[in-house]
Amino acid sequence: MTKQKFLHNLINVVAVFLFAVFLLFDGYTWGKFAFLAASLAIYVLGLWERNDKIVLRFDMYVVIYFVFIAYVLLTALWAKSAMSTITMARTLFRTFICAYIVYLYFVKEKDVSRLLRILMWAGYVVAIYSLMFYGVDELLKAGTDSSLRADNEFANVNSIAMCCALSCMIQANEFFEKRNRWTCVFLIPVLIVIGATQSRKALLFLIVGVFSAFIVKNQNESFVKKFGKIILGCVVAVLIIYGLLQLEIFSGIKQRMQTMFNSFTGNGKADGSSLTREKMIEIGWKEFTEHPVGGIGIANSYFITDKYLGIKTYLHNNFVELLSCGGVFAFIFYYAIYVYLFYNLWKYRNADKKQAMFFAIWLLIMLALDYGSVSYYSKVQNFYLMIHFVNIENLKRKARAKQIENNKICESGQKIHYKSLLSISD
């Protein structure tokens, strides 16, 4: 094994550890030092692997994030609790620095699929650790009834489930592309964990993500073939989903889905969690209408929930959280990230249609899930967005390479045409 190959594999291991440690050890004080150490290790090993020198990048990834973090800090001037806002700004800055260090290494990768496989393996590590932590029997029991849901003992169970669901989406993409099919065996612990956590968001992510991977696989087919395969895929997906929900381990999540629908329709037993979240959206929007420009200060939403609900927590909705705490400017500065990414995915879609489609669907799922969670300060979410920026740079390079190749073909064609004209005139 060459030095480059050894370092390449070692970086993969460190990166898997980094993405897994976000969830496994986020609650520990030393966690932030582990994040930084792993990030630096990836970059330093990368310099050694490529015989490279230290070069910093100042691109749109840096600009957009710095503008948002700077505005978060600015809201401390009028925040109800300036210290809470400053603490949040510090957390965002630390997370960005770790993500930026990793970005500097992976942005030079020719193929972004390496990063996706790292995420997939990180999800498998989290699932296996969860099985060892809770015990297989306990997790199997936890999925059988909504009252037995796994607790947030070492990490938030929704975050664990979402990480596992993303692994399923990436594994499905690998399967359809006929790569690493043997790793499908790790879907067993992943599905057990999703069932035990009873995360409705993770179940929806799993369903939409796997089906989307099927659509991406057929992206280069003709319209008729694509349409036919999508219809067939829909039928198969419905049958698989129905089959999964009949399993005892998914009984709890099925009950929670039913009570959630009841809370919207007003029929049957309603889900208290969904009703509370609806109330949070309502009071958050009310607070935004009273402070539309600058809000009440980032990370100050607990003042709102304490005032109206008697509990100190966040609003469980990223859109309302940003609007009520940071006003319209916080909303614009943060979601400028998504606007930039979607715009460039569309602009460079022809560089690699499958890659662009996969990331567009993933980004769309992330955006939709913001309706049920506060994600702007999540370490995992910020690293996911960093990967999307890496993907954009990768698509740009592919687009430039195609343009250069097309220019060469055009120049070659002109020369041939010129020579043929000479031969005729002679």
Over which residues does each language-model region extend?
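N-terminal signal-anchor transmembrane segment
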Residues: 1-49, 68-78, 366-368, 383, ...
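Membrane-interface helix-loop-helix junctions at transmembrane boundaries of multi-pass membrane enzymes
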Residues: 2-10, 47-63, 174-185, 218-229, ...
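Transmembrane alpha-helices of multi-pass inner-membrane enzymes
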Residues: 40-43, 169, 356-370, 375-426
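Aromatic-anchored transmembrane helix interface
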Residues: 61-70, 82-105, 114, 118, ...
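Alpha-helical transmembrane segments of multi-pass inner-membrane proteins
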Residues: 113-141, 152-219, 364
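Hydrophobic transmembrane alpha-helices and their immediate junctions
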Residues: 117, 180-181, 215, 219, ...
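Long extracytoplasmic/lumenal interhelical loops at the membrane interface
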Residues: 140-146, 150-151, 266-326
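A membrane-periplasm/extracellular boundary helix in multi-pass inner-membrane enzymes
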Residues: 196, 214-266, 285-290, 424
